[in-house]
Each structure stands twice: as C-alpha cells, then as structure tokens.
C-alpha cells in the first residue's frame, strides 16, 4: 500500500533525529562522564531568553520561570498543596468583592527599601488600570487597593472574583518597588530590575545569558546558590551537548531521541514529567477567512493525526486532548482529555461540502525552537493537510519575531502555539475565547460560550462555576476556534549532582534545586 507523504516525513524525521547529535560527543555507549561545574553556581539552559523585565508586560512562561527568583508574589500555588503565604502573611475573604491581606514585616527590596502596602497598591493598580500592558486582562477585575496601614491592605474587585487568589500567585502579580521606579523611572528599572526575591539582578547579555546573584538580605531561607546563570540556547543539539560536557546543570526541552544517549552517560539523566502546556492551533473564524467556515475547521481537525505525532515524533512525550483545560485545573472537563479525532476521508467530504473540492491555500505561522519539536510538528501537519487538498504556506519564525507578531494579532488563518497555566484554573485557559478577548485573533463569537465564560468569571459557587466551564469546553471543542493537539510533557536534562523535580507549571524556583 502506498505510504502517505506525511507518513514518509514522520519516518524520516524519526530516523534523522536518531542520527543527530552524536557527532560532537560520540555514541551513547561511549560518552565520557561529565565534568562537575562550580558547586556554588547553578547553570540552566533555556531555549529562549527572557523577553522583558517588566513583569506586567509579557505573558511568557519561560520568562516567568526566571522572574520567580527575582520577584515574590503575595502567595504561591503549586496546584497540589493549595495556596501558601509568600509576601502575604495572611488573607481573608471579607465579602464577594473584598479581600483583606496582611504583609510580612521586615521584607526588603534588593535596593534596601522596605516593602509596604504602598508597593502592593502601586503594583496591582498599575496592571489593573493600564490596558496597554499584556497582563492587564488578567487583573482588570481589580477596582482598587485600599491601604489600611504599612502592612495591611484590602483588594476591592469590580465584581465577585472567585479566581483572585489564583491570579495573585502567578505571572503579573510580583510586587514592584514603588519609590525606586517613581524616582529612577522605568528605563532604569528595566536595565537594573529590583525585586524582593532570593536572587537579584547582576548582568544580562541579551540572547546569551542572564546572571543572578544571591540576595543575602532575603527574608526567607538563605539562598542555596551564590550565582544562577540562565543561558539562552535555542538549538536542541547544543543544549544537549552542553549538558553532556558539564557546561550546564539543567537543560530544558530535550528531544526524545536524545534521552537514551543522556541516560547512558555517567553523571547526567533525562527526566520526563507532565506540564500544564497544551499545544494548539488558533484559527480565524471571521467570515472573511477561509477558516471562517465551521466545516473547514472541522476538516482541518480531522486531517491531523495527533496520536501519530505524539507516538512517533514525540516518542510518547504528550497526551492528546480536545481541551486546553487539563486535569488538575479548576473546571477541567476530563471527558475531552486523552481524546482526539482523526478521519481524513470525512475531512475531504467536509471540504467538498464547503465548496473546496479542489482544495485551497491558507497561511500557518509557527515558532522554530520555542517548543519541543515545534518545527517538525508543523511540517508534519502541513503534509497531513496536503493529503486532503489543503495547501499550507508555512512561516517558521524565531521566537522573538513570532512573539511580537502574536502580540500584534498579526497572523493569518492559523498559528501554532503552546499555552501553560500557572493559575491552575480554567479561566486563564478560556478567557481568550470571550467575544471581547478573541477580537482580532480568532474573532470567535459564540454568544452561549461568551455568556458561560463571563458568568463563570464571577460565580462564587465553586461547583456551579466548574460546570459552566465544562459546558463551555464542549461547545468550543465543536466550534474549533482552537484545535488542540496534545498536553506536552517536559523532558529535562539534569546533572546528577542535583536534587531537582521539574514542576507542573514549568517554574524554576532555583532554591528547590539543591546539591546532593
């Protein structure tokens, strides 16, 4: 039987990946043990650099994973043990729109200034009121922060806000130094950022490395490391090589084909762990786009064999899904998790019914090097779509250029992206599909979905709120403004001198990484 084009591509991709990376350091059986690096310095290799030190004006998980070591939240949430105090000592839900907080005393910023409730007010009201900031949509529910004393304050929301604590424990809510920024200005802050975290800024060589040093005045436990270096290494093979030669202690996004090689090298190991990240395609649904036809979107979905990509290209490092809200998140619809649809013959039939019997062209943009096997994945999808008559004009982009176009909502019919969820709540996963938030991106407009999402945003009844999100996910799965591929597992390379368990939310709290 004739093998499909994408099947041949998949076989070739697996063979080539299995042959790559071995020339620099020899075969898996013959690797030399890695050299131990400085015991007081931790080096982590990311695939991308930080995008900004403005914690309100980015929405990139890999950047947040660095920032959590420089800035503190009011509270933390790992998705397993619930909320824990960080800068806040205690909190109380006074009524549906009012939360009271008490700060820990004696906390200092890296420049020696004391943390007070004025800093909290400055931070949260900035992100809540400035609609030009990328994280504004996650905090515009805040009406006011009322300072009651140096260490006491209230947060007043515009409407009931059931997910407020989730928001205050994630990206965008790290507390900023009001006096320092107002005195020196934002330009100075962005060059010399100041937080309250266990590590403080030392040096940044853009697109190369960011170096942090221990904050000896930290209010919590003393930092475990004298220095932490985050290196930006986009190439998979280079990250692996640096891990094997001792140039880095931790390397993210290890290709599945390199796992055996790493595990056969003394002194290092590869660890596979689940994440919150769901890889997906976002499609334009407006009438002016070819993907505005629901039959076309369904055909695209049915033409993609997600399970084959997970099994072969990712070697099992993922779980197919028809929702972005994965188990462990408030509002998850587990009936849609672990499921995928694949029926290329029906896809052809749907395209014929939609008036595209002779096929059509569409634009697809994707990052190259940001996610595990992102380039190879979209190339396979391009081949799969060609099998049903869809010609894809594929644009592969460096992450910084892709991210800029993403912020500008400048993509064509489709783009490929992966979203994490450090809120552990369905609201973060689904808010982009309200009519207002979808405008200019997917242009999705389903009044029933919109009503469900807006109602859930304000519903203080936890059970009813979860049901609203679950129903919305069922409708979204049928409408397909987003086509979900798989929940991605992380494969992390680790020097065996370390104790380190990768987190579900992909954060690098470096003081949880310790020497054995």
List each model region and its residues.
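Extracytoplasmic/peripheral linker and loop segments enriched in polar/acidic and small residues
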Residues: 393-402, 428-496
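N-terminal lobe/hinge region of extracytoplasmic solute-binding protein
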Residues: 45-94, 125, 194, 507
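Long beta-strand-rich cores associated with HINT superfamily self-processing modules
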Residues: 492-516
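Surface-exposed binding/hinge segments that line
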Residues: 92, 137-179
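Structural transition elements
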Residues: 319-353, 371-375
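Gly/Pro-rich hinge or "lid" segments in bacterial periplasmic/extracellular proteins
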Residues: 78-82, 169-223, 227
């Amino acid at each position: 039987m004739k093998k499909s084009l994408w099947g041949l591509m998949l076989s070739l991709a697996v063979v080539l990946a299995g042959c790559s990376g071995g020339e620099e350091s020899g075969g898996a059986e013959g690797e030399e043990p890695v050299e131990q690096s400085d015991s007081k310095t931790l080096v982590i290799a990311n695939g991308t650099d930080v995008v900004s030190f403005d914690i309100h004006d980015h929405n990139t998980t890999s950047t947040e994973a660095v920032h959590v070591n420089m800035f503190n939240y009011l509270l933390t949430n790992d998705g397993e043990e619930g909320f824990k105090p960080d800068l806040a000592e205690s909190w109380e839900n006074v009524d549906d729109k009012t939360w009271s907080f008490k700060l820990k005393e004696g906390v200092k910023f890296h420049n020696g200034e004391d943390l007070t409730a004025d800093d909290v007010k400055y931070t949260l009201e900035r992100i809540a009121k400035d609609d030009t900031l990328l994280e504004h949509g996650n905090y515009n529910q805040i009406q006011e922060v009322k300072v009651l004393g140096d260490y006491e304050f209230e947060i007043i929301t515009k409407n009931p806000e059931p997910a407020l604590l989730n928001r205050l424990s994630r990206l965008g809510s790290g507390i900023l130094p009001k006096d320092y920024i107002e005195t020196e200005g934002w330009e100075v802050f962005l060059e010399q950022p100041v937080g309250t975290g266990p590590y403080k800024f030392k040096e940044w060589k853009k697109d190369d490395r960011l170096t942090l040093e221990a904050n000896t005045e930290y209010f919590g436990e003393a930092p475990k490391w004298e220095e932490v270096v985050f290196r930006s290494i986009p190439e998979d093979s280079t990250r692996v090589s640096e891990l094997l030669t001792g140039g880095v202690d931790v390397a993210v996004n290890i290709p599945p084909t390199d796992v055996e090689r790493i595990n056969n090298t003394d002194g290092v190991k590869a660890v596979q762990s689940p994440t919150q990240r769901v890889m997906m395609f976002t499609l334009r649904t407006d009438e002016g786009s070819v993907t505005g036809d629901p039959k076309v979107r369904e055909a695209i979905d049915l033409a993609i064999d997600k399970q084959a990509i997970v099994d072969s290209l990712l070697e099992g490092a993922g779980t197919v899904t028809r929702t972005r809200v994965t188990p462990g998140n408030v509002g998850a619809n587990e009936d849609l998790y672990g499921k995928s649809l694949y029926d290329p013959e029906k896809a052809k039939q749907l395209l014929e019914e939609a008036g595209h019997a002779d096929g059509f062209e569409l634009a697809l943009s994707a990052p190259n090097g940001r996610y595990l096997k992102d380039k190879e994945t979209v190339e396979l999808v391009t081949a799969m779509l060609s099998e049903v008559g869809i010609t894809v004009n594929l644009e592969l982009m460096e992450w910084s250029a892709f991210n800029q176009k993403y912020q500008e909502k400048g993509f064509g019919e489709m783009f490929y992206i992966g979203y994490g969820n450090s809120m552990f709540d369905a609201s973060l996963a689904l808010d982009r599909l309200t009519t207002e938030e979808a405008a200019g991106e997917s242009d999705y407009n389903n009044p029933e979905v919109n009503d469900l999402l807006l109602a859930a945003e304000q519903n203080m009844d936890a059970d009813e709120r979860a049901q609203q999100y679950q129903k919305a996910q069922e409708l979204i799965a049928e409408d397909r403004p987003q086509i979900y591929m798989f929940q991605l597992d992380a494969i992390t390379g680790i020097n065996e001198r370390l104790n380190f368990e990768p987190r579900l939310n992909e954060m690098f709290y470096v003081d949880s990484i310790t020497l054995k």
